[in-house]
């Protein structure tokens, strides 16, 4: 599936660049305890933005099945994303 392939490639990119997003999260947090959560949110937000951009480029909007697929892929890869932030 085209969307799944795209999302997996985005997850790969953002996990490789996780250190940059962790640094960005540090800039937004006074409390060091929430840096990892903030970085996770930034990364998932970037992936979601890219996901929506696919539809915008096609003059379309995601339907509930597309959103469900996005959510499932993020959940399935959340451990990988979190580990990339921690290491």
Tell where the protein language model's regions lie, with residue ranges.
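Acidic, low-complexity, intrinsically disordered interaction modules
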Residues: 36-56
């Amino acid at each position: 599936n085209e969307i799944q392939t795209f999302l997996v490639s985005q997850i790969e990119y953002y996990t490789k660049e996780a250190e940059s997003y962790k640094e960005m999260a540090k800039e937004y947090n006074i409390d060091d305890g929430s840096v990892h959560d903030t970085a996770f949110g930034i990364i998932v937000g970037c992936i979601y933005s890219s996901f929506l951009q696919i539809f915008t480029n096609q003059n379309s909007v995601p339907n509930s099945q597309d959103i469900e697929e996005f959510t499932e892929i993020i959940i399935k890869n959340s451990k990988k994303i979190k580990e990339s932030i921690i290491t």
